[in-house]
Curated annotation (Swiss-Prot):
Coiled coil: none annotated. One of its GO terms (cellular component) is cytoplasm. This is Lipoyl synthase. One of its GO terms (molecular function) is 4 iron, 4 sulfur cluster binding. Binds 2 [4Fe-4S] clusters per subunit. One cluster is coordinated with 3 cysteines and an exchangeable S-adenosyl-L-methionine. InterPro entries: Aldolase_TIM, Elp3/MiaA/NifB-like_rSAM, Lipoyl_synth, rSAM. [4Fe-4S] cluster 2 binds at residues 60, 64, 67. The gene is lipA. It catalyses: [[Fe-S] cluster scaffold protein carrying a second [4Fe-4S](2+) cluster] + N(6)-octanoyl-L-lysyl-[protein] + 2 oxidized [2Fe-2S]-[ferredoxin] + 2 S-adenosyl-L-methionine + 4 H(+) = [[Fe-S] cluster scaffold protein] + N(6)-[(R)-dihydrolipoyl]-L-lysyl-[protein] + 4 Fe(3+) + 2 hydrogen sulfide + 2 5'-deoxyadenosine + 2 L-methionine + 2 reduced [2Fe-2S]-[ferredoxin]. Residues 46-260 form the Radical SAM core domain. The keyword Iron-sulfur applies. Keywords: 4Fe-4S, Cytoplasm, Iron, Iron-sulfur, Metal-binding, S-adenosyl-L-methionine, Transferase. [4Fe-4S] cluster 1 binds at residues 34, 39, 45, 271. It comes from the Archaea. It comes from Picrophilus torridus (strain ATCC 700027 / DSM 9790 / JCM 10055 / NBRC 100828 / KAW 2/3).
Length: 286
Protein backbone atom coordinates (compact mmCIF):
# COMPACT_ATOMS: atom_id res chain seq x y z
CA UNK A 1 0.00 0.00 0.00
CA UNK A 2 1.26 3.49 -0.82
CA UNK A 3 1.59 5.92 2.08
CA UNK A 4 2.07 8.97 -0.14
CA UNK A 5 -0.05 10.46 -2.92
CA UNK A 6 -0.01 8.86 -6.37
CA UNK A 7 -0.19 11.08 -9.44
CA UNK A 8 -3.90 10.85 -10.22
CA UNK A 9 -4.42 12.92 -13.37
CA UNK A 10 -7.36 15.31 -13.12
CA UNK A 11 -8.52 17.54 -15.96
CA UNK A 12 -8.94 21.15 -14.86
CA UNK A 13 -12.45 22.58 -15.30
CA UNK A 14 -12.66 24.44 -18.61
CA UNK A 15 -14.36 24.41 -22.01
CA UNK A 16 -17.52 25.82 -23.52
CA UNK A 17 -19.80 23.06 -22.24
CA UNK A 18 -18.44 23.39 -18.71
CA UNK A 19 -18.92 27.16 -18.75
CA UNK A 20 -22.45 26.82 -20.15
CA UNK A 21 -23.53 24.32 -17.50
CA UNK A 22 -22.01 26.38 -14.68
CA UNK A 23 -23.78 29.56 -15.82
CA UNK A 24 -27.08 27.70 -16.30
CA UNK A 25 -26.96 26.33 -12.76
CA UNK A 26 -25.93 29.65 -11.24
CA UNK A 27 -28.75 31.50 -12.97
CA UNK A 28 -31.29 29.15 -11.37
CA UNK A 29 -29.62 29.03 -7.95
CA UNK A 30 -29.13 25.27 -8.32
CA UNK A 31 -26.35 23.17 -6.84
CA UNK A 32 -24.43 20.17 -8.11
CA UNK A 33 -22.69 17.63 -5.95
CA UNK A 34 -19.90 17.96 -8.51
CA UNK A 35 -19.09 21.40 -7.09
CA UNK A 36 -20.17 21.01 -3.46
CA UNK A 37 -18.23 17.78 -2.91
CA UNK A 38 -15.20 18.93 -4.93
CA UNK A 39 -15.54 15.98 -7.32
CA UNK A 40 -12.35 15.35 -9.34
CA UNK A 41 -14.36 14.37 -12.43
CA UNK A 42 -16.26 17.63 -12.78
CA UNK A 43 -14.47 18.66 -15.99
CA UNK A 44 -14.88 15.28 -17.72
CA UNK A 45 -18.53 14.85 -16.77
CA UNK A 46 -19.64 18.39 -17.52
CA UNK A 47 -17.84 18.43 -20.86
CA UNK A 48 -19.70 15.22 -21.81
CA UNK A 49 -23.00 16.86 -20.84
CA UNK A 50 -23.60 15.02 -17.56
CA UNK A 51 -24.22 16.72 -14.23
CA UNK A 52 -25.40 15.47 -10.86
CA UNK A 53 -27.91 17.88 -9.37
CA UNK A 54 -27.96 18.27 -5.60
CA UNK A 55 -31.40 19.26 -4.38
CA UNK A 56 -32.93 20.45 -1.10
CA UNK A 57 -30.26 23.08 -0.44
CA UNK A 58 -26.50 23.26 -0.08
CA UNK A 59 -26.36 22.60 3.68
CA UNK A 60 -26.60 19.07 5.07
CA UNK A 61 -28.13 18.16 8.43
CA UNK A 62 -25.45 15.50 8.94
CA UNK A 63 -21.71 15.73 9.40
CA UNK A 64 -19.97 12.76 7.80
CA UNK A 65 -16.25 13.22 8.36
CA UNK A 66 -15.22 12.57 4.74
CA UNK A 67 -17.64 15.00 3.12
CA UNK A 68 -17.08 18.61 2.04
CA UNK A 69 -20.76 19.56 1.85
CA UNK A 70 -21.47 22.33 4.37
CA UNK A 71 -23.55 21.99 7.54
CA UNK A 72 -24.97 25.48 8.09
CA UNK A 73 -28.50 26.63 8.88
CA UNK A 74 -31.16 24.52 7.18
CA UNK A 75 -33.29 26.67 4.91
CA UNK A 76 -36.87 26.03 3.75
CA UNK A 77 -37.23 23.95 0.61
CA UNK A 78 -37.69 25.82 -2.65
CA UNK A 79 -41.13 24.85 -4.02
CA UNK A 80 -39.96 25.85 -7.50
CA UNK A 81 -36.93 23.54 -7.42
CA UNK A 82 -38.58 20.70 -9.40
CA UNK A 83 -39.35 23.16 -12.20
CA UNK A 84 -35.88 24.74 -12.04
CA UNK A 85 -34.19 21.35 -12.33
CA UNK A 86 -36.52 20.38 -15.17
CA UNK A 87 -35.76 23.56 -17.13
CA UNK A 88 -32.00 23.21 -16.58
CA UNK A 89 -31.90 19.56 -17.68
CA UNK A 90 -34.02 20.41 -20.71
CA UNK A 91 -31.74 23.32 -21.66
CA UNK A 92 -28.63 21.15 -21.31
CA UNK A 93 -30.24 18.51 -23.54
CA UNK A 94 -29.20 15.67 -21.24
CA UNK A 95 -30.15 12.07 -21.94
CA UNK A 96 -29.19 10.83 -18.48
CA UNK A 97 -29.49 12.84 -15.30
CA UNK A 98 -28.45 12.06 -11.73
CA UNK A 99 -30.28 13.64 -8.78
CA UNK A 100 -28.91 13.54 -5.26
CA UNK A 101 -29.55 15.55 -2.13
CA UNK A 102 -28.28 16.64 1.22
CA UNK A 103 -29.78 14.97 4.29
CA UNK A 104 -32.76 16.86 5.70
CA UNK A 105 -33.33 15.34 9.13
CA UNK A 106 -34.95 18.65 10.09
CA UNK A 107 -38.00 17.91 7.93
CA UNK A 108 -40.86 15.63 9.06
CA UNK A 109 -40.55 13.40 5.98
CA UNK A 110 -36.78 13.93 5.64
CA UNK A 111 -37.41 15.65 2.29
CA UNK A 112 -38.75 12.53 0.57
CA UNK A 113 -41.85 14.22 -0.87
CA UNK A 114 -39.76 17.02 -2.37
CA UNK A 115 -37.26 14.54 -3.82
CA UNK A 116 -40.14 12.58 -5.36
CA UNK A 117 -41.57 15.77 -6.87
CA UNK A 118 -38.29 16.44 -8.69
CA UNK A 119 -38.29 12.92 -10.17
CA UNK A 120 -41.93 13.28 -11.19
CA UNK A 121 -41.25 16.51 -13.05
CA UNK A 122 -38.23 15.08 -14.86
CA UNK A 123 -40.26 12.10 -16.05
CA UNK A 124 -41.87 14.43 -18.60
CA UNK A 125 -38.53 14.63 -20.42
CA UNK A 126 -38.48 10.90 -21.21
CA UNK A 127 -34.84 10.55 -20.15
CA UNK A 128 -32.96 8.12 -17.92
CA UNK A 129 -33.11 9.21 -14.28
CA UNK A 130 -30.73 8.01 -11.59
CA UNK A 131 -31.18 9.07 -7.98
CA UNK A 132 -28.62 8.91 -5.19
CA UNK A 133 -30.73 9.03 -2.06
CA UNK A 134 -30.04 9.58 1.65
CA UNK A 135 -31.27 6.88 4.03
CA UNK A 136 -34.41 8.86 5.03
CA UNK A 137 -33.70 7.47 8.53
CA UNK A 138 -34.59 4.04 7.16
CA UNK A 139 -38.34 4.82 7.21
CA UNK A 140 -40.04 2.68 4.58
CA UNK A 141 -42.90 5.07 3.83
CA UNK A 142 -40.38 7.77 2.94
CA UNK A 143 -38.35 5.42 0.73
CA UNK A 144 -41.62 4.34 -0.91
CA UNK A 145 -42.13 7.88 -2.20
CA UNK A 146 -38.95 7.51 -4.27
CA UNK A 147 -39.68 3.96 -5.44
CA UNK A 148 -43.20 4.93 -6.53
CA UNK A 149 -41.79 7.48 -9.00
CA UNK A 150 -39.90 4.67 -10.77
CA UNK A 151 -36.50 6.22 -11.48
CA UNK A 152 -34.24 4.02 -13.61
CA UNK A 153 -31.58 3.62 -10.92
CA UNK A 154 -31.71 4.08 -7.15
CA UNK A 155 -28.32 4.47 -5.50
CA UNK A 156 -27.48 4.69 -1.82
CA UNK A 157 -23.89 4.63 -0.64
CA UNK A 158 -22.48 2.31 2.00
CA UNK A 159 -19.33 4.51 1.83
CA UNK A 160 -16.95 2.31 3.85
CA UNK A 161 -16.54 -1.04 5.58
CA UNK A 162 -18.42 -1.99 8.73
CA UNK A 163 -15.48 -1.44 11.12
CA UNK A 164 -14.91 2.15 9.99
CA UNK A 165 -18.50 3.30 9.66
CA UNK A 166 -18.74 4.98 13.07
CA UNK A 167 -15.49 6.83 12.45
CA UNK A 168 -16.27 7.93 8.90
CA UNK A 169 -20.02 8.57 8.82
CA UNK A 170 -22.43 10.66 10.87
CA UNK A 171 -23.79 8.80 13.94
CA UNK A 172 -27.29 8.89 12.43
CA UNK A 173 -26.07 6.82 9.49
CA UNK A 174 -25.30 3.14 9.83
CA UNK A 175 -23.80 0.23 7.92
CA UNK A 176 -26.79 -2.04 8.46
CA UNK A 177 -29.25 0.80 7.91
CA UNK A 178 -27.72 1.47 4.49
CA UNK A 179 -27.90 -2.22 3.61
CA UNK A 180 -31.52 -2.29 4.74
CA UNK A 181 -32.39 0.70 2.54
CA UNK A 182 -30.91 -1.03 -0.51
CA UNK A 183 -32.50 -4.36 0.38
CA UNK A 184 -35.90 -2.71 0.82
CA UNK A 185 -35.72 -0.94 -2.55
CA UNK A 186 -34.99 -4.25 -4.28
CA UNK A 187 -37.70 -6.09 -2.32
CA UNK A 188 -40.30 -3.59 -3.48
CA UNK A 189 -39.25 -3.23 -7.10
CA UNK A 190 -37.03 -4.42 -9.92
CA UNK A 191 -35.38 -1.00 -10.10
CA UNK A 192 -31.61 -1.12 -10.60
CA UNK A 193 -29.73 -0.48 -7.35
CA UNK A 194 -26.25 0.88 -6.87
CA UNK A 195 -23.77 1.65 -4.09
CA UNK A 196 -20.24 2.93 -3.61
CA UNK A 197 -17.18 2.21 -1.47
CA UNK A 198 -14.24 4.52 -0.76
CA UNK A 199 -10.70 3.24 -0.31
CA UNK A 200 -7.97 4.96 1.66
CA UNK A 201 -9.53 5.18 5.11
CA UNK A 202 -7.69 2.25 6.66
CA UNK A 203 -9.80 -0.64 5.38
CA UNK A 204 -8.31 -4.01 4.40
CA UNK A 205 -9.04 -5.84 1.16
CA UNK A 206 -10.79 -8.60 3.11
CA UNK A 207 -13.09 -6.00 4.67
CA UNK A 208 -13.87 -4.49 1.26
CA UNK A 209 -14.69 -7.92 -0.14
CA UNK A 210 -16.93 -8.60 2.87
CA UNK A 211 -18.75 -5.33 2.14
CA UNK A 212 -19.10 -6.30 -1.53
CA UNK A 213 -20.71 -9.57 -0.45
CA UNK A 214 -23.05 -7.68 1.89
CA UNK A 215 -24.08 -5.32 -0.92
CA UNK A 216 -24.64 -8.16 -3.36
CA UNK A 217 -26.70 -10.05 -0.78
CA UNK A 218 -28.82 -6.89 -0.43
CA UNK A 219 -29.61 -7.07 -4.15
CA UNK A 220 -27.28 -4.33 -5.37
CA UNK A 221 -26.64 -4.48 -9.14
CA UNK A 222 -23.91 -1.86 -9.65
CA UNK A 223 -20.98 -0.99 -7.41
CA UNK A 224 -18.35 1.72 -7.71
CA UNK A 225 -15.02 1.76 -5.89
CA UNK A 226 -12.93 4.92 -5.65
CA UNK A 227 -10.08 6.54 -3.76
CA UNK A 228 -10.96 8.84 -0.87
CA UNK A 229 -9.37 12.23 -1.52
CA UNK A 230 -9.44 14.66 1.39
CA UNK A 231 -11.48 17.69 0.23
CA UNK A 232 -10.13 20.13 2.85
CA UNK A 233 -8.18 20.00 6.10
CA UNK A 234 -11.48 19.79 7.98
CA UNK A 235 -12.12 16.23 6.78
CA UNK A 236 -10.46 12.92 7.67
CA UNK A 237 -6.88 12.42 6.55
CA UNK A 238 -6.15 9.87 3.84
CA UNK A 239 -4.66 6.75 5.42
CA UNK A 240 -3.27 5.38 2.15
CA UNK A 241 -3.38 5.94 -1.59
CA UNK A 242 -4.28 2.72 -3.37
CA UNK A 243 -2.35 1.67 -6.50
CA UNK A 244 -4.21 0.82 -9.70
CA UNK A 245 -3.54 -2.87 -9.12
CA UNK A 246 -5.67 -2.79 -5.98
CA UNK A 247 -8.59 -1.26 -7.86
CA UNK A 248 -8.24 -3.83 -10.64
CA UNK A 249 -8.14 -6.75 -8.19
CA UNK A 250 -11.21 -5.50 -6.32
CA UNK A 251 -13.04 -4.97 -9.61
CA UNK A 252 -12.35 -8.59 -10.55
CA UNK A 253 -13.53 -9.72 -7.11
CA UNK A 254 -16.74 -7.71 -7.45
CA UNK A 255 -17.53 -9.23 -10.84
CA UNK A 256 -16.83 -12.72 -9.48
CA UNK A 257 -19.29 -12.04 -6.64
CA UNK A 258 -21.96 -11.33 -9.24
CA UNK A 259 -22.39 -7.58 -9.78
CA UNK A 260 -23.75 -6.61 -13.20
CA UNK A 261 -21.43 -3.61 -13.57
CA UNK A 262 -18.38 -2.47 -11.62
CA UNK A 263 -16.43 0.79 -11.92
CA UNK A 264 -13.21 0.74 -9.92
CA UNK A 265 -10.44 3.32 -10.04
CA UNK A 266 -8.88 6.19 -8.09
CA UNK A 267 -11.17 8.91 -9.43
CA UNK A 268 -14.34 6.82 -9.68
CA UNK A 269 -17.32 8.26 -7.82
CA UNK A 270 -20.92 7.05 -7.52
CA UNK A 271 -22.21 9.02 -10.50
CA UNK A 272 -19.08 8.71 -12.64
CA UNK A 273 -20.01 7.60 -16.18
CA UNK A 274 -23.43 6.65 -14.86
CA UNK A 275 -24.96 6.30 -18.32
CA UNK A 276 -22.18 3.92 -19.33
CA UNK A 277 -22.90 1.74 -16.30
CA UNK A 278 -26.56 1.58 -17.33
CA UNK A 279 -25.74 0.57 -20.91
CA UNK A 280 -22.83 -1.80 -20.27
CA UNK A 281 -24.67 -3.47 -17.41
CA UNK A 282 -27.23 -4.60 -19.97
CA UNK A 283 -30.08 -2.88 -18.17
CA UNK A 284 -33.32 -1.94 -19.86
CA UNK A 285 -36.35 0.08 -18.87
CA UNK A 286 -39.51 -1.82 -18.03
Amino acid sequence: MNAGPINYKVKLPSGERYTFIKSTLSARNLYTVCEEAHCPNIAECWESGTATFMIMGSNCSRGCRFCAVTHGRMLPLDPMEPEKVYESVKMMNLDYVVITSVDRDDLPDKGSSHFAAVIRRLKDLKIKIEVLIPDFSGVHKFIDKIIDERPDVIAHNIETVRRLTKTVRDPRAGYDQSLNVLRYVKSRSNIITKSSIMLGLGETDDEVIETLHDLHDAGVDIVTIGQYLRPTKKQLEVKEYSPMERFKNLEESAYSIGFSFVASGPLVRTSYRAAEAFVKGGFKND
